[in-house]
Amino acid sequence: MRAGSGPTVPSGSGGRGGLFGGLRNRLGTGFRLAGRSLGVLREHPRLAVFPVVAAVGVVAFLAVVLGGVTLANGAESPAVAVASLAVLLAGPTFVTVLCNAALVHATRDAFEGRDPAIGRSFRAALSHWPQILAWALVSVVVGALLRSLEESSGLAGDVVAAVLSMGWAALTYFVVPVVVFEDAPARSMIQESGRLFRDTWGETMGAEVGVGVVAFLLVLPGIAVAGIGFFLASTPDGSLLALLVGALVAIPGLLVGVTLGDIAKVALYRFARDDEAPAEFADLDVLD
């Protein structure tokens, strides 16, 4: 991985061969980033604990508040119902982002040769809880607006919502590392994330594709089990059982895929911010 101030334009990018050659290079880099991220996870399997904690935490949170929301549905005060719904929507997002922040912190520890301790990483993430809460609320609001646009405007709304969703995902790709490593306030974390994405857009997109393909391959056995079992089942109960077994087979792969994505994200953040890569990624020529 070569230091530099930002992405360079591949030679001959003005022609068709240069354009597609550049895309191939970016995608190739993305697959190599995914492979190196898998190597980091093999060396530090504890990193995969954080997505598990997130999943368990979301389920536990929903179980706790579901009764309150049920009561709120019959409440006379609309404010109580709205507040309960807001908690139901924002709470799982907060739990997920908190665990994601802890994983990001643990990944940096692993890159720097320290043991990625679970407790220390969660304490570090909790020290940024105001920004994490703000980001969770923003995510919920933006997500609701995009869904509303998609559902209310037909095909045109679907297209616009999809484009805006991709743009939002790109703009906010580095929000969690910016919060964890820079303690950025809510008003600037999205702006700084967008700047970092601009500097590494090709590598980031390549990494997302590479990690996405790896994650798909990891969950493919579960999809196959669910699909084959569903079509071979002779009863509704058998079909449901096949789907449940397939989900159980796919979940570990899904959690590993989430972990790989965050490992690659921290590596890209380090490169964009410090112009140097973690040792595990140092020989990748990212900007070619």
PLM features: residue spans?
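Hydrophobic alpha-helical membrane segments
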Residues: 1-288
